[in-house]
A protein has these predicted regions:
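Membrane-helix interface segments
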Residues: 1-3, 61-71, 93-97
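Hydrophobic alpha-helical transmembrane segments
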Residues: 4-8, 45, 69-74, 100-104
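Small-polar-interrupted transmembrane alpha-helices in polytopic inner-membrane proteins
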Residues: 7-18, 68-88
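Short, highly charged, low-complexity non-transmembrane loops/tails of multi-pass membrane proteins
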Residues: 125-145
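Membrane-interfacial alpha-helical segments at the cytosolic side of multi-pass membrane proteins
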Residues: 45-61, 105-121
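Membrane interface segments of multi-pass transport proteins and intramembrane proteases
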Residues: 31-36, 59-67, 123-130
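"…centered on the first transmembrane helix and the immediately adjacent amphipathic helix/loop
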Residues: 1-56, 139, 145-148
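Interfacial helix-loop-helix junctions of multi-pass membrane proteins
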Residues: 24-31, 80-108
Length: 149
C-alpha cells in the first residue's frame, strides 16, 4: 500500500505541474523563471521516475519484472498522454506531442536502467554468490571433518 501511495502522490505532483499556468500565482511565477529547454526536458526524469515507482510497486506485489516493467511503462505513458490532453484544456497552456516523446524517452531510459541492473546482478553478483556459497560449503565440510576426528 505504501508503494501505491507514493506512486499516486507522485502522479499528483506531475498533474499539478501540468496545470500550472506560467505567470499566474506563486507557482506560475516560479515556472516562468525556468528556461524553456530545461522545462521541456524535465518530462524525461519525471516520467522515468514514475515508471520506476510503478514497476517497484508491482514487484512488491510479487509481479515478475518481465510483466511489471511493460505494464508500468504503459501506465506511465498513458498518464503522460492524459496529462498532455488535460494540459491542452487549461487556458494559457498547450498540449505538445514533443512533450509526450520526451515522456517516452524518460520511460525508456528508466526501463533500460532497471533491465541493465537485473542483467548486471545476474552476470556479476550471481557467480560471486555461487563462489562464496561453494567456499562456505567446503569450509563447513572441512570443519565437520575436523570435529569428527
Amino acid at each position: 500500500m505504501l508503494a501505491l501511495g507514493i506512486a499516486l502522490g507522485y502522479m499528483g505532483l506531475l498533474y499539478f505541474g501540468a496545470v500550472i499556468v506560467p505567470g499566474i500565482g506563486f507557482s506560475g511565477h516560479l515556472l516562468a523563471q525556468v528556461p524553456g529547454n530545461f522545462l521541456d526536458w524535465a518530462h524525461a526524469p519525471g516520467y522515468g521516475i514514475l515508471a520506476l515507482l510503478l514497476t517497484r510497486g508491482l514487484q512488491r506485489r510479487s509481479w515478475p519484472l518481465a510483466y511489471a516493467l511493460p505494464v508500468a511503462a504503459g501506465a506511465a505513458f498513458v498518464f503522460g498522454l492524459w496529462t498532455e490532453v488535460f494540459q491542452g484544456s487549461v487556458q494559457g497552456r498547450e498540449s505538445n506531442v514533443d512533450d509526450l516523446v520526451v515522456d517516452a524517452i524518460g520511460i525508456g531510459i528508466a526501463a533500460t536502467m532497471m533491465l541493465s541492473a537485473t542483467v548486471r546482478n545476474r552476470i556479476v553478483l550471481r557467480p560471486c554468490l555461487d563462489s562464496f556459497l561453494s567456499l562456505w560449503r567446503v569450509g563447513s565440510l572441512v570443519s565437520l571433518v575436523r570435529r569428527t576426528k
